[in-house]
């Protein structure tokens, strides 16, 4: 029995693995590739060039791979690449890239993108991230592994969201968020570190204590960023987790959320 509903529309150039499921009224456009075990629900629109990996699930009314609304976009060929084991819930929108940046929007593996979230053009989402309902990423946003963006979080273009970071509900992020940091508010302010997330992921208590001290160095001692980075040199050499925190600050191009 075919796993493609007869009411779905599949472009002849689309490439689907044999066990891909496509629900009624969904449209799989030209240049779309879908890997094995992926399930496309009803009323989904997929536009290419888009490559979707293995064992993903995309729910109804999502629009994946559509043209970017960026006014610089003039119809150039750009792409969207989605990895494996992602869940994309109802009404999600994900746009392809632009030639002015990297020509590609990327979603990694094992991510949960919840209802009505938006991923803008040229954004790069890592692995094991959660974008909760109505979270919206502008163009060129980078989200590192294990980050969690709570409902209605808004992220300004070109911001970098560090690994294992966490945003509270309704947060408006306009600057980079360092790794492990918890932010909340409009505009976003750093409140603490995502210690609960670290414990759930098996971080040692020594590493957590080292990160707690590193956070206080950056946020509680009245130091400039350069002064704080100098203070972090020794603990970063001892704890790789502190090095990740330090490096996420050092590489910031928009300034960090304070």
Curated annotation (Swiss-Prot):
Q: Where are the transmembrane segments?
A: none
Q: In which pathway does it act?
A: Glycolipid biosynthesis; lipid IV(A) biosynthesis; lipid IV(A) from (3R)-3-hydroxytetradecanoyl-[acyl-carrier-protein] and UDP-N-acetyl-alpha-D-glucosamine: step 1/6
| Major location category of this protein | cytoplasm
Tell me which GO cellular component terms the UniProt record holds.
Answer: cytoplasm; membrane
A single Gene Ontology MF term assigned here is: acyl-[acyl-carrier-protein]-UDP-N-acetylglucosamine O-acyltransferase activity
Query: Known EC number(s)?
Result: 2.3.1.129
Cellular localisation: Cytoplasm
Q: Which UniProt keywords apply?
A: Acyltransferase, Cytoplasm, Lipid A biosynthesis, Lipid biosynthesis, Lipid metabolism, Repeat, Transferase
Statement: the UniProt record of this protein carries the keyword Cytoplasm: yes
Name the domain of life this protein comes from.
Bacteria
Task: List, in alphabetical order, the GO biological process terms annotated in this UniProt record.
Answer: lipid A biosynthetic process
Q: Which reaction does it catalyse?
A: a (3R)-hydroxyacyl-[ACP] + UDP-N-acetyl-alpha-D-glucosamine = a UDP-3-O-[(3R)-3-hydroxyacyl]-N-acetyl-alpha-D-glucosamine + holo-[ACP]
Q: Which InterPro entries match?
A: Acetyltransf_C (IPR029098), Acetyltransf_C_sf (IPR037157), Hexapep (IPR001451), Hexapep_transf_CS (IPR018357), Lipid_A_LpxA (IPR010137), Trimer_LpxA-like_sf (IPR011004)
| Subunit field text | Homotrimer.
What's this protein's family per the entry?
Belongs to the transferase hexapeptide repeat family. LpxA subfamily.
Q: Which NCBIfam families match?
A: lipid_A_lpxA, PRK05289.1
Write out the function statement from the record. Involved in the biosynthesis of lipid A, a phosphorylated glycolipid that anchors the lipopolysaccharide to the outer membrane of the cell.
Q: What is the name listed in the Swiss-Prot or TrEMBL entry for this protein?
A: Acyl-[acyl-carrier-protein]--UDP-N-acetylglucosamine O-acyltransferase
Organism, as annotated: Pseudomonas fluorescens (strain ATCC BAA-477 / NRRL B-23932 / Pf-5)
Q: Lineage of the native species?
A: Bacteria, Pseudomonadati, Pseudomonadota, Gammaproteobacteria, Pseudomonadales
Report which gene this protein is encoded by. lpxA
